Amino acid sequence: MAKSSLKNLLTLVNEAKKQSPVAESFLQDYLQSIERTANSNKRKPSAHYKPSSLNCIRNMFYQIVEQEPDSSIKEAPLIGIGESGTDRHEHLQNAVIEMKKNGFACEYLDVAKYVEQKELPGIIVKGKRGIETQLFNETWNISFLCDGIIKYRGELYIIEFKTEVSRKFVTRNDVDEDHKRQAIAYSLSLGLDKIIFVYENRDTCEKK
């Protein structure tokens, strides 16, 4: 019985080895398909500044002349990292929306309605990307996505989520300097001087 079981196991192993070239071929085709989809959907940069580009004069130049600073093809791992970051943002934002239902003094405000009600000069609502709201500041030619505005314990705040690798997260004890510059652009555009940053560890989902 034991010899028969061992023989069956060896047969399965050998069959798996025979199939491995097919599996490897599938994997390579799968990765290439991901890359082709992502790269064919690449949008031409708009001639507007983005808060994240304000930290680098070079990036600002490429943005305003509608050029990609790096025209290389994106590879599947980097595409996946970007997609996972977008997915996490949606989960993090949905968790904020649930806070009021769970008895906490926190209300997630509709950014588009807030902009319209406040009649903020030069601020145009371009649309939605999931829960995020795409805004454009005509005065400064800045286009940006707002994670959200919340009313927490009676005060209004812009809320911004950031995900990062463990190496950065474990030493995180303050808002990143680059993110502070982004916050200034958001604050001046929306007329709100209070911003809450939530950082999440991509590997463990811990938060600070």
Placement of each model-derived feature along the sequence:
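Metal-dependent nuclease catalytic cores that hydrolyze phosphodiester bonds in DNA/RNA
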Residues: M1-I158, V165-R167, T171
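Short amphipathic alpha-helical face segments that pack within enzyme cores
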Residues: D87, H91, R181-A185, S189
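A short beta-strand motif that forms part of the nucleic acid-binding face
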Residues: K162-V165, N201-D203
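Hydrophobic/aromatic-lined pockets within catalytic cores
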Residues: I97-K100, T163, L188-K194
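Metal-dependent nuclease catalytic regions and adjoining charged, substrate-binding loops involved
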Residues: L9, N14-V22, T171-D176, L188-K208
